[in-house]
Amino acid sequence: MIIAFFLLIQCVYCVIWPPLSVDNEVALRSQRDVSYNVSVDQLVDVGVRLSTVIFERDTYTQPYLNRVDNLLNASVGNILIDAYWDEGGFNWQLCPAPFSANVTPIADGSTILQLEWDNKQYTCDRRLDLASIFTRIDEHIRASARSVSLNLITIYMSLHSIGTQNPTPVSQPGTLSRPLVRSIDQVQILTPASLRVAQLSNSTYQGLEFDPNGYPILGELLQSRGIRVIPIILENNMYEDTSYELERDSNLYFIQNSTIDVTQTNTADTKLTDLTTNITNWTIADSQALLSESFRLVMETEEDPFSLESYTNHISHGYSPFLNRKYNESEIRQFAVNRLWSWKNSYLPEVSVPLLGDQDDSNSANETLQCASFSNLSWIISSCDEPRQVACRNSSYWLQWTVTSTLSNYYGATEACPVGTFFDIPRTPLDSMTLQREIPLNSSVWIDLNTLDSGGCWISGGAEAECPYHRVTLVSLYVEILTPSSVVSIVLIAIVVLLHFVRIPIQKNRKYWRKLQDNIKDSDGIPS
């Protein structure tokens, strides 16, 4: 009872990442699909530091771990895990205090311990470790393997030392790799070796352009190779004379400043602030300079937390913002719904065609609202019949855009582009920035995105493009419609049908039934 009450009190403060609405899912999926031909180091999404956003700074127990599922189900693409190496116990753990420290169980036989370390108090569950998080990630990977919500997860690790060094080595010390490969199939992990193979086979890129030292594109990893995870050791804050040898994990993890160069900065960087507030004077050279930097991250600090404006500015300029403090539900919801660089506010407008929109409904006011235009760094649902200028990409230099001087409806957009260009859509935030510089403020142009083939399935490829998810989407939606109440109704109908065809045994033996009725009629006791 004590443990249950303790966990209940903790969970009052659990931060719940809001689930995706249908509109959120459609928006997120269309942005992902448009980015399929983009190298994975140029992808932009919100990141979450688990130790500060999900866990309390001093509490590591199961109720908080359950909140990781919310992040994964919402397809959050970047997760930062603080891992602690117990120098005395030779093991990795999530708890910032060594279990060999001054320990007090909260109840007899409990795995939840009160620990005192470095003049701080911690509450930690012994059962909660790195494998606990990796297992949740694996469960998400398996659940979404055949789903339209397929996504890539980049796991960043920040390493710390705790405890007193033990002069006596052990035969099998812990490693970061062991819990990862025991939880997630290694074929689903991009490793330094598999990246090198891709580079040698000339299948790596920088953005949309071939680069022998670049990274695979998103579509190849997800669709062709089934890779779902990129593990990166981002920060090494361990003792200088630590007993842990980082090279043990170099075959599985990318290591910052060794096998990978992550561009990491924080909100206190005034140079970055100047960069991310520049929109009107943005140049192709600005985009090209940032493209040379891989996995661009910006971490908020206690002194300079994200505002909603700075958060969205970083996303628009190609940086993945990492949430790194405690939030209330209202704040976290604002950041969650503004995480996309494409459809602003993460929502498709209410006038959008539903996911299962009836294409034959001639009375629908939304029947022509099936095409997308671009304005003020945002995709906007528009009527396909409206005349607009057209966004055309240079065939030789992918960051160069041309906007037609003549107007066209969506159906004629492909033919409207001049020689040497083609009708296309911005596929990264930096791509959007270079297109925006060609468009007058508050004006809009056609981009190659529509839902003409199937309501809610936003695809590029012109007006004749076919939705690859139509059948899958229908099936998944019908499964969602089959709610528990529907299941109960079906079971009740089955019981009624079963009783209709199967007679109860007592009615089959009519002779015995009549004898039983006669016996009941006999008086029992003294007649009055």
Curated annotation (Swiss-Prot):
The keyword Transcription regulation does not apply. Disulfide bonds: none annotated. Residues 502-528 are cytoplasmic. It is found in: Membrane. Residues 1-14 form the signal peptide. InterPro entries: Telomere_Capping_Maintenance. Glycans are attached at N37, N73, N202, N257, N278, N281, N328, N366, N376, N394, N442. It is a single-pass type I membrane protein. Residues 15-480 are extracellular. Keywords: Glycoprotein, Membrane, Signal, Transmembrane, Transmembrane helix. GO terms for cellular component: membrane. The chain crosses the membrane at residues 481-501. Belongs to the MTC6 family. May be involved in telomere capping. This is Maintenance of telomere capping protein 6.
